[in-house]
Protein backbone atom coordinates (compact mmCIF):
# COMPACT_ATOMS: atom_id res chain seq x y z
CA UNK A 1 0.00 0.00 0.00
CA UNK A 2 1.34 3.45 -0.83
CA UNK A 3 -0.97 5.24 1.57
CA UNK A 4 -1.90 4.53 5.16
CA UNK A 5 -5.18 2.72 5.50
CA UNK A 6 -6.08 4.75 8.58
CA UNK A 7 -5.25 8.18 9.91
CA UNK A 8 -2.44 7.81 12.40
CA UNK A 9 -4.37 9.54 15.17
CA UNK A 10 -6.59 7.48 17.43
CA UNK A 11 -8.66 10.05 19.33
CA UNK A 12 -11.08 7.66 21.01
CA UNK A 13 -8.25 5.43 22.22
CA UNK A 14 -6.32 8.49 23.39
CA UNK A 15 -9.33 9.73 25.36
CA UNK A 16 -9.67 6.33 27.04
CA UNK A 17 -5.93 6.24 27.74
CA UNK A 18 -6.16 9.66 29.38
CA UNK A 19 -9.04 8.45 31.56
CA UNK A 20 -7.13 5.31 32.45
CA UNK A 21 -3.97 7.23 33.34
CA UNK A 22 -5.95 9.16 35.95
CA UNK A 23 -6.91 6.02 37.86
CA UNK A 24 -4.43 3.30 36.81
CA UNK A 25 -0.60 3.42 37.04
CA UNK A 26 0.68 4.15 33.56
CA UNK A 27 -2.85 3.87 32.18
CA UNK A 28 -2.70 0.09 31.71
CA UNK A 29 -3.01 -3.11 33.71
CA UNK A 30 0.02 -4.81 32.15
CA UNK A 31 3.03 -2.65 31.19
CA UNK A 32 3.68 -3.78 27.61
CA UNK A 33 0.20 -2.61 26.60
CA UNK A 34 1.24 1.02 27.18
CA UNK A 35 3.22 1.26 23.89
CA UNK A 36 6.19 2.68 25.81
CA UNK A 37 8.64 0.62 23.74
CA UNK A 38 7.25 1.87 20.42
CA UNK A 39 5.62 5.18 21.31
CA UNK A 40 2.21 6.45 20.32
CA UNK A 41 -1.28 5.83 21.60
CA UNK A 42 -2.14 2.35 22.87
CA UNK A 43 -5.15 1.03 21.02
CA UNK A 44 -8.17 0.32 23.21
CA UNK A 45 -10.08 -2.58 21.71
CA UNK A 46 -13.84 -2.93 21.92
CA UNK A 47 -14.39 -6.25 20.15
CA UNK A 48 -12.74 -9.21 18.50
CA UNK A 49 -14.11 -11.57 15.86
CA UNK A 50 -12.11 -14.34 14.24
CA UNK A 51 -8.68 -12.93 13.28
CA UNK A 52 -9.73 -9.30 13.75
CA UNK A 53 -9.79 -6.70 16.51
CA UNK A 54 -11.80 -3.47 16.38
CA UNK A 55 -10.61 -0.46 18.36
CA UNK A 56 -12.51 2.37 20.02
CA UNK A 57 -12.13 4.47 16.86
CA UNK A 58 -13.88 1.81 14.80
CA UNK A 59 -10.75 0.60 13.01
CA UNK A 60 -10.27 -3.07 12.25
CA UNK A 61 -6.91 -4.83 12.59
CA UNK A 62 -5.61 -8.26 11.67
CA UNK A 63 -4.53 -9.52 15.08
CA UNK A 64 -1.05 -11.06 15.40
CA UNK A 65 -1.09 -10.90 19.20
CA UNK A 66 -4.09 -13.16 19.89
CA UNK A 67 -4.23 -11.92 23.49
CA UNK A 68 -0.55 -12.95 23.84
CA UNK A 69 -1.32 -16.50 22.76
CA UNK A 70 -4.63 -17.77 24.21
CA UNK A 71 -6.87 -17.08 21.21
CA UNK A 72 -5.64 -19.97 19.07
CA UNK A 73 -9.14 -20.44 17.61
CA UNK A 74 -9.56 -16.72 16.97
CA UNK A 75 -11.78 -14.29 18.83
CA UNK A 76 -15.34 -15.14 19.86
CA UNK A 77 -15.32 -18.70 18.56
CA UNK A 78 -19.02 -19.67 18.62
CA UNK A 79 -18.54 -22.99 20.44
CA UNK A 80 -16.37 -21.40 23.13
CA UNK A 81 -18.86 -18.55 23.53
CA UNK A 82 -21.74 -21.04 23.82
CA UNK A 83 -19.90 -23.00 26.52
CA UNK A 84 -19.23 -19.80 28.45
CA UNK A 85 -22.84 -18.62 28.19
CA UNK A 86 -24.09 -21.97 29.42
CA UNK A 87 -21.66 -21.91 32.35
CA UNK A 88 -22.49 -18.32 33.32
CA UNK A 89 -26.18 -19.18 33.43
CA UNK A 90 -25.40 -21.77 36.11
CA UNK A 91 -23.39 -19.35 38.26
CA UNK A 92 -20.05 -17.59 38.07
CA UNK A 93 -18.27 -18.97 41.15
CA UNK A 94 -19.13 -21.50 43.83
CA UNK A 95 -16.13 -21.72 46.14
CA UNK A 96 -16.54 -25.51 46.07
CA UNK A 97 -15.27 -28.30 43.85
CA UNK A 98 -17.16 -28.57 40.55
CA UNK A 99 -17.21 -31.06 37.69
CA UNK A 100 -15.76 -28.57 35.20
CA UNK A 101 -12.42 -28.40 36.98
CA UNK A 102 -12.21 -32.20 37.03
CA UNK A 103 -13.02 -32.40 33.32
CA UNK A 104 -10.40 -29.79 32.42
CA UNK A 105 -7.74 -31.52 34.51
CA UNK A 106 -8.63 -34.85 32.88
CA UNK A 107 -8.32 -33.30 29.42
CA UNK A 108 -4.88 -31.93 30.25
CA UNK A 109 -3.60 -35.19 31.74
CA UNK A 110 -4.91 -37.07 28.70
CA UNK A 111 -3.02 -34.81 26.29
CA UNK A 112 0.30 -34.35 28.12
CA UNK A 113 1.96 -37.60 29.23
CA UNK A 114 4.23 -36.17 31.99
CA UNK A 115 1.17 -34.71 33.74
CA UNK A 116 0.22 -37.40 36.25
CA UNK A 117 -1.59 -34.88 38.47
CA UNK A 118 -2.45 -31.23 37.97
CA UNK A 119 -3.59 -28.32 40.19
CA UNK A 120 -5.59 -25.46 38.68
CA UNK A 121 -4.83 -21.82 39.51
CA UNK A 122 -5.81 -18.48 37.97
CA UNK A 123 -2.64 -17.13 36.32
CA UNK A 124 0.70 -18.19 34.92
CA UNK A 125 2.41 -16.27 37.71
CA UNK A 126 0.54 -18.35 40.30
CA UNK A 127 1.47 -21.51 38.45
CA UNK A 128 5.21 -20.84 38.38
CA UNK A 129 5.24 -19.44 41.92
CA UNK A 130 3.49 -22.56 43.19
CA UNK A 131 5.71 -24.92 41.20
CA UNK A 132 8.84 -23.30 42.65
CA UNK A 133 7.44 -23.53 46.19
CA UNK A 134 6.56 -27.18 45.63
CA UNK A 135 10.03 -27.93 44.23
CA UNK A 136 11.63 -26.35 47.27
CA UNK A 137 9.31 -28.21 49.62
CA UNK A 138 9.91 -31.54 47.90
CA UNK A 139 13.71 -31.25 47.75
CA UNK A 140 14.13 -29.27 50.99
CA UNK A 141 16.49 -26.98 49.11
CA UNK A 142 16.29 -23.24 48.44
CA UNK A 143 18.15 -22.18 45.29
CA UNK A 144 16.61 -21.97 41.83
CA UNK A 145 18.34 -21.75 38.45
CA UNK A 146 16.62 -19.62 35.80
CA UNK A 147 17.80 -18.18 32.51
CA UNK A 148 18.27 -14.58 31.43
CA UNK A 149 15.45 -13.53 29.11
CA UNK A 150 13.04 -16.22 30.27
CA UNK A 151 9.91 -14.81 31.89
CA UNK A 152 7.96 -16.80 34.46
CA UNK A 153 5.44 -14.23 35.61
CA UNK A 154 6.05 -11.51 38.17
CA UNK A 155 7.22 -13.87 40.92
CA UNK A 156 9.67 -11.97 43.15
CA UNK A 157 12.46 -14.51 42.95
CA UNK A 158 12.11 -14.97 39.17
CA UNK A 159 12.11 -11.35 37.98
CA UNK A 160 15.92 -11.16 37.79
CA UNK A 161 16.99 -10.72 34.15
CA UNK A 162 13.47 -11.62 33.02
CA UNK A 163 11.97 -11.33 29.56
CA UNK A 164 8.59 -10.00 28.37
CA UNK A 165 7.72 -6.60 29.88
CA UNK A 166 10.90 -6.59 31.95
CA UNK A 167 12.91 -6.87 28.74
CA UNK A 168 10.71 -4.34 26.97
CA UNK A 169 11.36 -1.72 29.63
CA UNK A 170 15.08 -2.63 30.00
CA UNK A 171 14.71 -3.26 33.72
CA UNK A 172 17.62 -5.34 35.04
CA UNK A 173 15.75 -5.92 38.27
CA UNK A 174 12.75 -4.39 39.98
CA UNK A 175 12.41 -2.50 43.27
CA UNK A 176 10.45 -4.46 45.84
CA UNK A 177 12.41 -7.68 45.37
CA UNK A 178 14.62 -8.12 48.41
CA UNK A 179 18.24 -9.15 48.34
CA UNK A 180 17.38 -12.29 50.28
CA UNK A 181 14.87 -13.34 47.63
CA UNK A 182 17.25 -12.59 44.78
CA UNK A 183 20.14 -14.40 46.45
CA UNK A 184 18.37 -17.73 46.06
CA UNK A 185 18.03 -17.24 42.29
CA UNK A 186 20.94 -18.19 40.04
CA UNK A 187 20.60 -16.50 36.64
CA UNK A 188 22.47 -18.15 33.76
CA UNK A 189 22.78 -17.49 30.01
CA UNK A 190 20.13 -19.34 28.03
CA UNK A 191 21.24 -22.29 25.89
CA UNK A 192 24.49 -22.68 27.90
CA UNK A 193 24.73 -26.15 29.46
CA UNK A 194 28.30 -25.56 30.63
CA UNK A 195 27.03 -22.74 32.85
CA UNK A 196 24.40 -25.08 34.30
CA UNK A 197 26.96 -27.74 35.16
CA UNK A 198 29.19 -25.09 36.74
CA UNK A 199 26.30 -23.80 38.88
CA UNK A 200 25.53 -27.28 40.20
CA UNK A 201 29.22 -27.77 40.99
CA UNK A 202 29.37 -24.44 42.83
CA UNK A 203 26.23 -25.14 44.90
CA UNK A 204 26.22 -28.86 45.75
CA UNK A 205 23.03 -29.98 47.49
CA UNK A 206 21.51 -26.47 47.39
CA UNK A 207 19.62 -26.26 44.07
CA UNK A 208 15.95 -27.22 44.28
CA UNK A 209 15.14 -26.89 40.60
CA UNK A 210 15.95 -25.53 37.20
CA UNK A 211 13.09 -23.62 35.57
CA UNK A 212 13.04 -22.67 31.91
CA UNK A 213 10.49 -21.69 29.30
CA UNK A 214 10.03 -24.87 27.29
CA UNK A 215 10.78 -22.80 24.19
CA UNK A 216 11.19 -19.14 25.13
CA UNK A 217 8.94 -16.51 23.61
CA UNK A 218 9.46 -13.65 26.06
CA UNK A 219 12.70 -12.30 24.60
CA UNK A 220 11.32 -12.88 21.16
CA UNK A 221 11.21 -16.48 20.01
CA UNK A 222 14.50 -18.16 20.94
CA UNK A 223 14.16 -21.95 20.66
CA UNK A 224 16.31 -24.27 22.74
CA UNK A 225 19.36 -25.58 20.92
CA UNK A 226 19.23 -29.31 20.15
CA UNK A 227 19.82 -31.24 23.35
CA UNK A 228 19.55 -28.25 25.68
CA UNK A 229 16.32 -29.22 27.47
CA UNK A 230 17.41 -32.85 27.70
CA UNK A 231 20.70 -31.64 29.14
CA UNK A 232 18.81 -29.69 31.79
CA UNK A 233 16.74 -32.77 32.63
CA UNK A 234 19.88 -34.91 32.92
CA UNK A 235 21.72 -32.35 35.06
CA UNK A 236 18.77 -32.10 37.44
CA UNK A 237 18.48 -35.88 37.73
CA UNK A 238 22.20 -36.22 38.44
CA UNK A 239 22.10 -33.58 41.17
CA UNK A 240 18.83 -34.36 42.97
CA UNK A 241 17.01 -31.28 41.61
CA UNK A 242 13.70 -31.01 39.75
CA UNK A 243 13.38 -29.93 36.13
CA UNK A 244 10.50 -27.43 35.77
CA UNK A 245 9.29 -26.70 32.24
CA UNK A 246 7.25 -23.50 31.90
CA UNK A 247 4.68 -24.15 29.17
CA UNK A 248 2.44 -21.20 30.00
CA UNK A 249 3.03 -19.89 26.48
CA UNK A 250 3.78 -23.08 24.53
CA UNK A 251 1.29 -25.39 26.24
CA UNK A 252 -1.47 -26.47 23.82
CA UNK A 253 -0.16 -23.77 21.46
CA UNK A 254 2.84 -25.44 19.78
CA UNK A 255 1.13 -28.84 19.55
CA UNK A 256 -1.64 -30.91 21.12
CA UNK A 257 0.81 -31.68 23.95
CA UNK A 258 2.63 -28.34 23.87
CA UNK A 259 6.41 -28.21 23.52
CA UNK A 260 6.63 -31.61 25.17
CA UNK A 261 4.77 -32.91 22.14
CA UNK A 262 7.36 -31.33 19.85
CA UNK A 263 10.53 -32.31 21.70
CA UNK A 264 9.60 -35.15 24.05
CA UNK A 265 11.78 -34.18 27.02
CA UNK A 266 9.99 -35.27 30.23
CA UNK A 267 9.98 -32.63 33.00
CA UNK A 268 9.35 -33.28 36.69
CA UNK A 269 6.94 -30.33 36.90
CA UNK A 270 5.20 -28.26 34.23
CA UNK A 271 3.27 -24.99 34.24
CA UNK A 272 0.44 -23.97 31.92
CA UNK A 273 -1.79 -20.98 31.16
CA UNK A 274 -3.03 -18.94 28.19
CA UNK A 275 -4.55 -21.47 25.72
CA UNK A 276 -5.91 -23.74 28.47
CA UNK A 277 -8.19 -20.91 29.67
CA UNK A 278 -9.82 -20.12 26.34
CA UNK A 279 -9.34 -16.41 26.99
CA UNK A 280 -10.27 -16.54 30.69
CA UNK A 281 -7.93 -16.38 33.70
CA UNK A 282 -6.91 -20.01 34.12
CA UNK A 283 -3.57 -21.72 34.61
CA UNK A 284 -2.15 -24.88 36.14
CA UNK A 285 0.92 -26.69 37.37
CA UNK A 286 1.46 -30.41 37.57
CA UNK A 287 3.72 -33.34 36.90
CA UNK A 288 5.01 -36.36 38.78
CA UNK A 289 2.46 -37.80 41.21
CA UNK A 290 5.05 -38.32 43.96
CA UNK A 291 5.98 -34.63 43.79
CA UNK A 292 2.39 -33.40 43.57
CA UNK A 293 1.56 -35.54 46.64
CA UNK A 294 3.48 -32.99 48.72
CA UNK A 295 0.86 -30.35 47.90
CA UNK A 296 -1.84 -29.51 50.48
CA UNK A 297 -4.21 -31.02 51.48
CA UNK A 298 -2.41 -34.26 50.59
CA UNK A 299 0.94 -32.94 51.81
CA UNK A 300 2.62 -30.10 53.72
CA UNK A 301 3.28 -27.57 50.90
CA UNK A 302 0.47 -25.02 51.00
CA UNK A 303 -1.21 -23.51 47.95
CA UNK A 304 -4.76 -22.17 47.58
CA UNK A 305 -6.93 -19.79 45.55
CA UNK A 306 -10.47 -18.46 45.89
CA UNK A 307 -11.15 -18.56 42.15
CA UNK A 308 -8.98 -21.56 41.24
CA UNK A 309 -10.96 -23.87 38.94
CA UNK A 310 -13.53 -21.15 38.25
CA UNK A 311 -16.51 -22.78 36.47
CA UNK A 312 -16.69 -20.22 33.66
CA UNK A 313 -12.96 -20.36 32.98
CA UNK A 314 -12.89 -24.15 33.01
CA UNK A 315 -15.85 -24.27 30.62
CA UNK A 316 -14.05 -21.98 28.17
CA UNK A 317 -10.80 -23.89 28.49
CA UNK A 318 -12.40 -27.29 28.05
CA UNK A 319 -14.35 -26.14 24.99
CA UNK A 320 -11.18 -24.80 23.41
CA UNK A 321 -9.10 -27.90 24.13
CA UNK A 322 -11.80 -30.14 22.65
CA UNK A 323 -11.66 -28.15 19.41
CA UNK A 324 -7.88 -28.37 19.13
CA UNK A 325 -7.34 -31.50 17.08
CA UNK A 326 -4.59 -32.36 14.60
CA UNK A 327 -6.42 -30.52 11.82
CA UNK A 328 -6.53 -27.33 13.90
CA UNK A 329 -2.78 -27.44 14.51
CA UNK A 330 -2.15 -28.15 10.82
CA UNK A 331 -4.11 -24.98 10.02
CA UNK A 332 -2.32 -22.80 12.56
CA UNK A 333 1.09 -24.10 11.51
CA UNK A 334 0.33 -23.50 7.82
CA UNK A 335 -0.91 -19.95 8.39
CA UNK A 336 2.13 -19.18 10.53
CA UNK A 337 4.50 -20.52 7.87
CA UNK A 338 2.75 -18.46 5.20
CA UNK A 339 3.05 -15.22 7.18
CA UNK A 340 6.67 -15.94 8.08
CA UNK A 341 7.47 -16.34 4.38
CA UNK A 342 5.76 -13.04 3.56
CA UNK A 343 7.68 -11.19 6.27
CA UNK A 344 10.99 -12.67 5.12
CA UNK A 345 10.27 -11.80 1.49
CA UNK A 346 9.36 -8.18 2.27
CA UNK A 347 12.34 -7.48 4.53
CA UNK A 348 14.78 -9.23 2.18
CA UNK A 349 13.53 -7.22 -0.79
CA UNK A 350 14.28 -3.98 1.08
CA UNK A 351 17.70 -5.22 2.22
CA UNK A 352 16.80 -5.13 5.92
CA UNK A 353 19.06 -7.27 8.09
CA UNK A 354 16.81 -9.61 10.01
CA UNK A 355 16.52 -13.05 11.54
CA UNK A 356 13.11 -14.70 11.75
CA UNK A 357 12.87 -17.47 14.33
CA UNK A 358 10.01 -19.80 15.16
CA UNK A 359 8.96 -22.46 17.62
CA UNK A 360 6.22 -24.37 15.85
CA UNK A 361 3.63 -21.68 14.99
CA UNK A 362 5.07 -19.05 17.36
CA UNK A 363 7.52 -16.68 15.66
CA UNK A 364 9.18 -13.28 15.83
CA UNK A 365 11.57 -11.08 13.84
CA UNK A 366 14.88 -9.83 15.20
CA UNK A 367 16.43 -6.91 13.34
CA UNK A 368 19.89 -8.42 13.14
CA UNK A 369 21.57 -10.72 10.63
CA UNK A 370 22.89 -13.03 13.34
CA UNK A 371 21.09 -16.02 14.90
CA UNK A 372 19.65 -15.25 18.32
CA UNK A 373 20.38 -17.96 20.89
CA UNK A 374 20.16 -16.00 24.15
CA UNK A 375 19.05 -12.76 25.77
CA UNK A 376 22.26 -10.87 24.95
CA UNK A 377 21.79 -11.68 21.27
CA UNK A 378 18.17 -10.50 21.45
CA UNK A 379 19.17 -7.19 23.03
CA UNK A 380 21.78 -6.58 20.33
CA UNK A 381 19.18 -6.17 17.57
CA UNK A 382 18.31 -2.79 16.04
CA UNK A 383 15.03 -2.30 17.88
CA UNK A 384 14.50 1.12 16.31
CA UNK A 385 13.76 -0.68 13.05
CA UNK A 386 11.08 -2.72 14.77
CA UNK A 387 9.44 0.52 15.96
CA UNK A 388 9.14 1.80 12.40
CA UNK A 389 7.98 -1.61 11.17
CA UNK A 390 5.37 -1.82 13.94
CA UNK A 391 3.86 1.61 13.31
CA UNK A 392 3.63 1.14 9.57
CA UNK A 393 1.77 -2.13 10.04
CA UNK A 394 -0.45 -0.63 12.74
CA UNK A 395 -1.40 2.26 10.47
CA UNK A 396 -2.25 -0.24 7.74
CA UNK A 397 -4.46 -2.39 9.94
CA UNK A 398 -2.11 -5.09 11.26
CA UNK A 399 -1.69 -5.35 15.03
CA UNK A 400 1.68 -6.67 16.23
CA UNK A 401 2.95 -7.03 19.80
CA UNK A 402 4.15 -3.52 20.73
CA UNK A 403 7.64 -4.77 21.62
CA UNK A 404 10.49 -6.45 19.77
CA UNK A 405 10.86 -8.86 22.70
CA UNK A 406 7.57 -10.70 22.20
CA UNK A 407 6.28 -13.61 20.15
CA UNK A 408 3.76 -13.19 17.34
CA UNK A 409 0.73 -15.48 17.31
CA UNK A 410 -1.84 -16.64 14.76
CA UNK A 411 -5.04 -18.67 14.94
CA UNK A 412 -7.17 -21.11 12.99
CA UNK A 413 -9.34 -18.11 12.06
CA UNK A 414 -6.61 -16.34 10.06
CA UNK A 415 -8.08 -16.92 6.62
CA UNK A 416 -6.96 -15.88 3.11
CA UNK A 417 -8.46 -12.40 3.50
CA UNK A 418 -6.54 -11.79 6.74
CA UNK A 419 -3.28 -13.08 5.27
CA UNK A 420 -3.75 -10.93 2.16
CA UNK A 421 -4.19 -7.83 4.30
CA UNK A 422 -0.89 -8.62 6.00
CA UNK A 423 0.75 -9.19 2.61
CA UNK A 424 -0.56 -5.84 1.35
CA UNK A 425 0.78 -4.00 4.41
CA UNK A 426 4.25 -5.57 4.54
CA UNK A 427 6.04 -3.75 1.67
CA UNK A 428 5.51 -0.33 3.25
CA UNK A 429 6.49 -1.67 6.67
CA UNK A 430 9.70 -3.15 5.28
CA UNK A 431 10.56 0.18 3.63
CA UNK A 432 9.90 1.97 6.91
CA UNK A 433 12.25 -0.42 8.70
CA UNK A 434 14.92 0.07 6.02
CA UNK A 435 14.71 3.86 6.27
CA UNK A 436 14.59 4.00 10.09
CA UNK A 437 17.44 5.62 12.01
CA UNK A 438 18.43 5.20 15.64
From Swiss-Prot:
Record field: catalytic activity: (S)-4-amino-5-oxopentanoate = 5-aminolevulinate
Disulfide bonds: none
Pathway: Porphyrin-containing compound metabolism; protoporphyrin-IX biosynthesis; 5-aminolevulinate from L-glutamyl-tRNA(Glu): step 2/2
Entry EC number(s): 5.4.3.8
Subcellular location: Cytoplasm
EC class (word): isomerase
PROSITE patterns reported for this sequence: AA_TRANSFER_CLASS_3
Entry-linked InterPro entries: 4pyrrol_synth_GluAld_NH2Trfase (IPR004639), Aminotrans_3 (IPR005814), Aminotrans_3_PPA_site (IPR049704), PyrdxlP-dep_Trfase (IPR015424), PyrdxlP-dep_Trfase_major (IPR015421), PyrdxlP-dep_Trfase_small (IPR015422)
Cofactor dependence: pyridoxal 5'-phosphate
A Pfam short name: Aminotran_3
Molecular-function GO terms, alphabetical: glutamate-1-semialdehyde 2,1-aminomutase activity; pyridoxal phosphate binding; transaminase activity
Sorted UniProt keywords: Cytoplasm, Isomerase, Porphyrin biosynthesis, Pyridoxal phosphate
UniProt KW Isomerase keyword: yes
Biological process terms in GO annotation: protoporphyrinogen IX biosynthetic process
GO cellular component, one term: cytoplasm
Modified residues (N6-(pyridoxal phosphate)lysine): 274
SUPFAM superfamilies: PLP-dependent transferases
PANTHER family: GLUTAMATE-1-SEMIALDEHYDE 2,1-AMINOMUTASE, GLUTAMATE-1-SEMIALDEHYDE 2,1-AMINOMUTASE 1, CHLOROPLASTIC-RELATED
Subunit structure comment from the entry: Homodimer.
Annotated family: Belongs to the class-III pyridoxal-phosphate-dependent aminotransferase family. HemL subfamily.
Name recorded for this polypeptide: Glutamate-1-semialdehyde 2,1-aminomutase
Amino acid sequence: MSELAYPYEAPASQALFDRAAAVTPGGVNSPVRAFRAVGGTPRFMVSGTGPYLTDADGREYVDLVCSWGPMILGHAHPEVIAAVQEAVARGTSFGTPAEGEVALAEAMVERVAPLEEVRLVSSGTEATMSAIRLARGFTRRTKVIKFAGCYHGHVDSLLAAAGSGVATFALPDTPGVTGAQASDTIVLPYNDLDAVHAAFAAHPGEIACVITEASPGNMGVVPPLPGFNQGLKDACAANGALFVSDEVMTGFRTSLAGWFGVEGVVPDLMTFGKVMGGGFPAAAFGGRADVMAHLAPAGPVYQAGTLSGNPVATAAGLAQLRLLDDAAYDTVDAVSAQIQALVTEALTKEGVAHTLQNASNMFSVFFTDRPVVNYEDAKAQESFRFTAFFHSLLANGVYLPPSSFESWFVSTAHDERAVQRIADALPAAARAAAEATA
